[in-house]
């Protein structure tokens, strides 16, 4: 497997020593980025599945906690996220043609873990959108010994009164080739860049919000 060096922002990651982020290609040619951290005498490897609008460096602190416990980690920029290839010209839109396309990224990530000889057994820690991706991966036979899900996206909460409209809009926009457009009422900028800590709905940890 060809693992070409990719940009890696160690000062942003605040992760364990020896961080790096190679490029790799999914089976359909989409270029993605992974980030491994490996302590000496590791007891196994945790596959970190990020959520939407997240990226390798954001998991540096999580990797550091696991590193101190003698676990290697590897995380990923999903297609449309971080520094991975985009499906649309506007890099701010993390569009995918089909949600199952993420399984191609998972397969490439596992191949990278094997090529890097990351220690077994493998474990999975999946957050938000990564939880949705991770659940399908488990169903399809992801070779992990144990799993942790953090706020997994196993559904999208929609008020019962607006649900039929949302379903019709979602189906209809895809039918006419407009499935890449933002839903009404949403913003193109990432939530964390537009909401102050006091008003945010994602975390009660001020240090992590600032990080």
How would you label these PLM feature ranges?
Residues 94-114:
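Alpha/beta-hydrolase active-site loop
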Residues 1-26, 30-38:
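An N-terminal hydrophobic leader/cap segment in hydrolases
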Residues 47-51, 127:
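The conserved beta1-alpha1 loop
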Residues 129, 133-211:
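Alpha/beta-hydrolase-fold enzymes
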Residues 56, 63-89:
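Conserved alpha/beta-hydrolase
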Residues 38-45:
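Proline/glycine-enriched tight loop/beta-turn segments at coil->beta junctions
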Residues 116-128:
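Alpha/beta-hydrolase fold nucleophile elbow
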